[in-house]
Amino acid sequence: MLRLLLLWLWGPLGALAQGAPAGTAPTDDVVDLEFYTKRPLRSVSPSFLSITIDASLATDPRFLTFLGSPRLRALARGLSPAYLRFGGTKTDFLIFDPDKEPTSEERSYWKSQVNHDICRSEPVSAAVLRKLQVEWPFQELLLLREQYQKEFKNSTYSRSSVDMLYSFAKCSGLDLIFGLNALLRTPDLRWNSSNAQLLLDYCSSKGYNISWELGNEPNSFWKKAHILIDGLQLGEDFVELHKLLQRSAFQNAKLYGPDIGQPRGKTVKLLRSFLKAGGEVIDSLTWHHYYLNGRIATKEDFLSSDVLDTFILSVQKILKVTKEITPGKKVWLGETSSAYGGGAPLLSNTFAAGFMWLDKLGLSAQMGIEVVMRQVFFGAGNYHLVDENFEPLPDYWLSLLFKKLVGPRVLLSRVKGPDRSKLRVYLHCTNVYHPRYQEGDLTLYVLNLHNVTKHLKVPPPLFRKPVDTYLLKPSGPDGLLSKSVQLNGQILKMVDEQTLPALTEKPLPAGSALSLPAFSYGFFVIRNAKIAACI
């Protein structure tokens, strides 16, 4: 599958590619790379890597108070610029109640905010946080049971809940995308927009800058709520929401959707009819992807190149339908992680999950996905970037490195030779906002699924350029199942409650091969490359 993708991407460019020198037949562990750097393949959004807060966090709004934690905000700020999507299954079971009083935890937080600058205000009290953290495991069990049994109850959220979400996004440098309840229906199954109107009125009165979605995975509405909505009706609902936005202070707000699940059978049919009825009013098409069922996924699945390759076909299906019906429409991964159902216990929150995450980012950029929203930044389940104690997990550090080193311009790279599936390489122009690097530099990111170290040789014009290595490996006795990660041999952890550590490079001697140990991943920045496509 990966070979077919490379043929599709590389096409006639192979003849133009800069290859390794003739006569350098590689041994098993020395690999020659090819780069095509004449022009960018495409550009992705500066917010390409984005994050989500699952709507389930608002089921009991007390737990939204977590978002007042300065530590959590500092971690989110590290991933800016990014979108923050508030959505998920519970989107369609949350109802805004403007008359609902804040919880005691929310009141405690807001009363402490004596500073008019909310982003420089007092943190949530330690006592409140401790109380919530003690109660969170029980709430998490309730949420996961609800998800497994597919028996969802409506909940209400208040103005205070909206304020907490918005202040978290604003103070973290994130752009909030808010998912509206699509299961509020009239007797003839049209969308009932009255509750959305109440929320729009409130957000308008506060001057909030928010983008919007409507519903979550409409292909599974029947399973979740025994309501069947086809693509035509859903498209008409989006047109109605667009009209609502046009009549409000949100006339310039963005609208995204339909947030369908995996592109199979009836879901693809729903997408087609949705795009025909409502495709013109959305700014980007959103869909969701997970590789595996979290309840049965194995470590071997997480390290399988065949599993990674399944993503390619899903992307191709989505792009094909989009191009046919709404050519030129941008496509986003509106929600994605390793395994659905909250992730795979003892896997989705470990170093092993990084292979799926980094490969998905690389393939998405290559194939034309403009934004990838990681489920979830913080919340229930096992696929979060930050755990219940506000400790960053391996995928957080991987995401942070990606943000700092990888720019939006996408280039082509590939491994020379027949077997490319277990050594997966991706190439971008370097992020020019990194103080150490400049226009024209290259960032190569690689994952090695072989059980031996691989030594990579870049094409000859770049072979003598200085290279900085950022190698990620698990830390501690748990190996690939570790929740701790080291960068170039140093364990990554926060310096204090609001300070991220320096991500220190390891410079290589000029002309060195780029070594990547077995079952590891990392980034190589080729400095002073002076690549025209990156200038």
Swiss-Prot record:
- What is the annotated signal peptide range for this record? 1-27
Q: Which residues are glycosylated?
A: N192, N209, N451
Membrane topology, as annotated: Peripheral membrane protein
Activity: how regulated: Inhibited by EDTA and activated by calcium and magnesium. Inhibited by laminarin sulfate and, to a lower extent, by heparin and sulfamin.
Q: Where is this region: Required for transferring proheparanase to the Golgi apparatus, secretion and subsequent enzyme activity and for enhancement of PKB/AKT1 phosphorylation?
A: 519-535
Q: Which GO terms describe its molecular function?
A: cargo receptor ligand activity; heparanase activity; syndecan binding
Tissue specificity here reads: Expressed in skin, mainly in the stratum granulosum and the first layer of the stratum corneum in the upper part of the epidermis. Also detected in hair follicles and in sebaceous glands.
Key words of the record: Calcium, Cell adhesion, Disulfide bond, Glycoprotein, Hydrolase, Lysosome, Magnesium, Membrane, Nucleus, Secreted, Signal
Q: Which InterPro entries match?
A: Glyco_hydro_79 (IPR005199), Glycoside_hydrolase_SF (IPR017853)
Instruction: Check the record and name the PANTHER family matching this protein.
Output: HEPARANASE
* Protein name as catalogued: Heparanase
Organism taxonomic ancestry: Eukaryota, Metazoa, Chordata, Craniata, Vertebrata
